[in-house]
From Swiss-Prot:
Lineage: Bacteria, Pseudomonadati, Pseudomonadota, Alphaproteobacteria, Hyphomicrobiales
Protein name, entry field: Imidazolonepropionase
GO biological process: L-histidine catabolic process to glutamate and formamide; L-histidine catabolic process to glutamate and formate
Binding site for Fe(3+): H72, H74, H242, D317
Catalytic activity of the protein: 4-imidazolone-5-propanoate + H2O = N-formimidoyl-L-glutamate
Gene name linked to the record: hutI
PANTHER family per the UniProt record, alphabetical: IMIDAZOLONEPROPIONASE, IMIDAZOLONEPROPIONASE-RELATED
Length: 407
């Protein structure tokens, strides 16, 4: 018998989808958490507990999954890019918008005009929308500063968001996102003057959990990203990469050679790149919001990824220009409908594999003893409903680190 205390919470009368490979739904399930950590997940018949002093929550037969993980966002920014949306409707491509001075650079001015506190306030409505759909963990990238201070302010805002909302924030340093106008044609100088010293400062301030980059014809070359990743390696910071979104430069293969946590987008990934990712354990992060928003026609090679044994995560890619999306539930539906991911691939892609893509699978992403008690409790009969519905939020309540934080 487990001795209970007021620090123990017990969820009874539940059905549990643990998101563990090969595991089935546990009916008539019980979840026990102590001091925010899971101590039991399984059938009620397998547990004996003295619950006189514990808080017991009757789930009414609802389905419980791990709290969702959005593993790729640019959610901290100022302004919007609705005008570019109109440009694309009139026929301009993503590359044409970027080469005309729009795209990422156009968000920089609006973002750098805000203080850290103002960035937090601007981002909260977007963050709150994701949390309302069961998200417990959120990755946030810099990339709209393009100066040392601008990049670090975005990361400071990301850290601050974790203090004002019940959410786990994982940060990525993305100074190698674009070059500002004053460095046009001088990528090497920008890397030397901004990217590398900014990484040093961010690392010293404990603002950086991973280093990211945009490897593409309109951004940085493979060799330029190697320079950035070599510096991250010296500092002991994990890396990840936006790769093969608009063309195949071999970025995913290069990232895999550094043991990258993930390579993201991947519409133009080839078999060689997929095999390199599989060998390195690099997760493929699929981003249907960007594919949809820029009216892309080339889909990521899902079957090639499956055949190679690459694990797949999905994410919103929430950003002001190419994926103004704040619904991980809709992202699941897009992944299934546009890219033919299975229900299991979608749900595990927004939980287990998303946590793996952030390097935090030991903390969250599945419902297993020892992990954080991050739960999403749903008013649904079967898991497929999370993927099947469009524009409907069936969340009943959210639990973060063992505490109910929203209904």
């Amino acid at each position: 018998m487990i001795g209970a205390s007021k620090l123990i919470r017990i969820w009874i009368n539940a059905r549990v989808y643990p998101a563990i490979a090969g595991a089935e739904i546990i009916n008539d399930a019980v979840i026990v958490a102590k001091e925010g950590r899971l101590t039991f997940v399984g059938p009620a018949s397998a547990l004996s507990i003295d619950d006189r002093d514990a808080e017991t929550i009757d789930c009414g037969g609802r389905l419980i999954t791990p709290g969702l993980v959005d593993c790729h966002t640019h959610i901290v920014f100022g302004g919007d890019r609705a005008m570019e949306f109109e440009m694309r409707l009139e026929g301009s491509t993503y590359e044409e918008v970027a080469r005309a001075g729009g795209g990422i650079v156009s968000s920089v001015k609006a973002t750098n005009a805000l203080t850290v506190d103002q960035l937090v306030q601007a981002s909260l409505p977007r963050v709150d929308t994701l949390l309302s759909e069961g998200v417990s963990t959120l990755e946030i990238k810099s990339g709209y500063g393009l100066t040392i201070e601008g990049e670090l302010n975005i990361l400071r805002a990301a850290r601050a968001l974790e203090k004002v909302r019940p959410v786990r924030v994982v940060t990525s340093y993305l100074a190698a996102h674009a070059t500002p106008p004053e460095y046009k044609g001088r990528h090497a100088d920008y890397i030397a003057d901004v990217v590398l010293p900014g990484m040093d400062r961010g690392h010293a301030e404990k603002l950086i959990d991973a280093v990211d980059g945009f490897c593409e014809g309109i951004a940085f070359t493979v060799d330029e990203m190697r320079r950035v990743f070599n510096h991250a390696k010296v500092l002991g910071i994990p890396v990840k990469l936006h790769a093969e979104q608009l063309s195949n430069l071999g970025g995913a293969k290069m990232a895999a050679s550094y043991g990258a946590l993930s390579a993201d987008h991947l519409e133009y990934l080839d078999k060689e790149g997929a095999e390199a990712m599989a060998k390195a354990g690099t997760v493929a992060v699929i981003l249907p919001g960007a594919f949809y928003a820029i009216n892309e026609t080339r889909k990521p090679p899902i079957q090639t990824l499956r055949d190679a044994g690459v694990r797949m995560a999905i994410a919103t890619d929430c950003n002001p220009g190419t994926s103004p999306l704040t619904s991980l539930l809709l992202t699941m539906n897009m992944s299934a409908t546009l890219f033919r991911l299975t229900v299991e691939e979608c749900i595990c892609g927004a939980t287990r594999e998303a946590a793996r893509a952030l390097g935090i699978l030991d903390t969250t992403g599945t419902l297993e003893v020892g992990k954080s008690a991050d739960l999403a409790i749903w008013n649904i009969e079967r898991p497929a409903e999370l993927v099947y519905r469009i524009g409907f939020n069936p969340l009943h309540s959210r639990v973060f680190k063992g505490k109910q934080v929203s209904t």
